[in-house]
Amino acid sequence: MSLEREEPQHFGAGPAQMPTPVLQQAAKDLINFNDIGLGIGEISHRSKDATKVIEDSKKHLIELLNIPDTHEVFYLQGGGTTGFSSVATNLAAAYVGKHGKIAPAGYLVTGSWSQKSFEEAKRLHVPAEVIFNAKDYNNGKFGKIPDESLWEDKIKGKAFSYVYLCENETVHGVEWPELPKCLVNDPNIEIVADLSSDILSRKIDVSQYGVIMAGAQKNIGLAGLTLYIIKKSILKNISGASDETLHELGVPITPIAFDYPTVVKNNSAYNTIPIFTLHVMDLVFQHILKKGGVEAQQAENEEKAKILYEALDANSDFYNVPVDPKCRSKMNVVFTLKKDGLDDQFLKEAAARHLTGLKGHRSVGGFRASIYNALSVKAVQNLVDFIKEFAEKNA
């Protein structure tokens, strides 16, 4: 069986297309890793080889994001949904460990994923409230992020265990252009951000975040593993909250496998880490480094988003982009046709050109082009050409 393939043009939202060189190397390593006679999925997660994979991946991520010494990198099984739970209980405990009392978490709801994260915190009986729901500022629909002047009064002078946001909402095509200044400038607020769909797509200042979580299967690897970047001070605060105190205050206890200090203390291997999945993630890190790092990747991503949105806007009598231009996602471009009855034809003709994965999320319909890091400018240009031709033919 050959490890060669024609470069895909797959715009699926995740699991997403991956760099072919990464998959080729991973396939070889699954059979015989570093000439040790075993595949990487067969080695002990506590062996020297596995430990080196863990350490190398952290080293490469630190280089890519310029992660300061104030923060720690670790990995957990699961995905973003697992993180919804672990963030809520760990960060609630951190606040108790620091202050000896509880405070609500605050959620900025800009789409379905931040909404689901809030709902999970409530389900677990972690004190939580919505600071704003973007639907309230956009006629009952997601697709806009309200200016912070409209909601910053809701956080001034108020204690929160953390403030949560999803930087890029894949379903609704909404992305925060930057972190809200009112959060960044408040030393009492720990920002917790879900970067599952835009991690390593653009430069960020890690020092501004209390916790970053990112599921792997969109921009950095295969499903089943999530990376975390956390302030070391938060880890210390979590450890400072005893189970007895948490019980007395009614704060749920985090299951041991998802207790952040325990995971960090055991180098992400307290529970058997899927080392093959982590190795693939590290191969992605190395691939981006070889391309010129996050700065080069960001320039490429901005070019892809630019030509795609320009094509849709130039044919605005035929296509509709239901997202405020101020917060249009550079990762997930959502759009609909203004003419009824053509959706299936659009997908069929796109597939004939090997442009796949364009169907919109079942909850919103229409179309979604996910242009993650692994999608080339050429692939997006091919989609742009098709979008223009389809509009001309069916206007």
Swiss-Prot record:
GO terms for biological process: L-serine biosynthetic process; purine nucleobase biosynthetic process. The keyword Hydrolase does not apply. Its cofactor is pyridoxal 5'-phosphate. Pathway: Amino-acid biosynthesis; L-serine biosynthesis; L-serine from 3-phospho-D-glycerate: step 2/3. CDD domains: PSAT_like (cd00611). The modification Phosphoserine is found at residue 112. GO terms for cellular component: cytoplasm. Pyridoxal 5'-phosphate binds at residues 80-81, 113, 170, 194, 217, 271-272. The modification Phosphothreonine is found at residue 20. Its EC number is 2.6.1.52. The modification N6-(pyridoxal phosphate)lysine is found at residue 218. Disruption phenotype: Impairs growth in absence of serine and leads to adenine bradytrophy (slow growth). Induction: Expression is regulated by the general control of amino acid biosynthesis mediated by GCN4. Expression is increased in response to DNA replication stress. GO terms for molecular function: O-phospho-L-serine:2-oxoglutarate aminotransferase activity; pyridoxal phosphate binding. The keyword Phosphoprotein applies. It catalyses: O-phospho-L-serine + 2-oxoglutarate = 3-phosphooxypyruvate + L-glutamate; 4-(phosphooxy)-L-threonine + 2-oxoglutarate = (R)-3-hydroxy-2-oxo-4-phosphooxybutanoate + L-glutamate. It comes from the Eukaryota. Keywords: Amino-acid biosynthesis, Aminotransferase, Phosphoprotein, Pyridoxal phosphate, Serine biosynthesis, Transferase. Binds 1 pyridoxal phosphate per subunit. Present with 15900 molecules/cell in log phase SD medium. Belongs to the class-V pyridoxal-phosphate-dependent aminotransferase family. SerC subfamily. Homodimer. PANTHER family: PHOSPHOSERINE AMINOTRANSFERASE. Phosphoserine aminotransferase (PSAT) is a pyridoxal 5'-phosphate-dependent enzyme involved in the second step of the phosphorylated pathway of serine biosynthesis. Catalyzes the reversible conversion of 3-phosphohydroxypyruvate to phosphoserine and of 3-hydroxy-2-oxo-4-phosphonooxybutanoate to phosphohydroxythreonine. Plays an indirect role in purine biosynthesis. This is Phosphoserine aminotransferase.
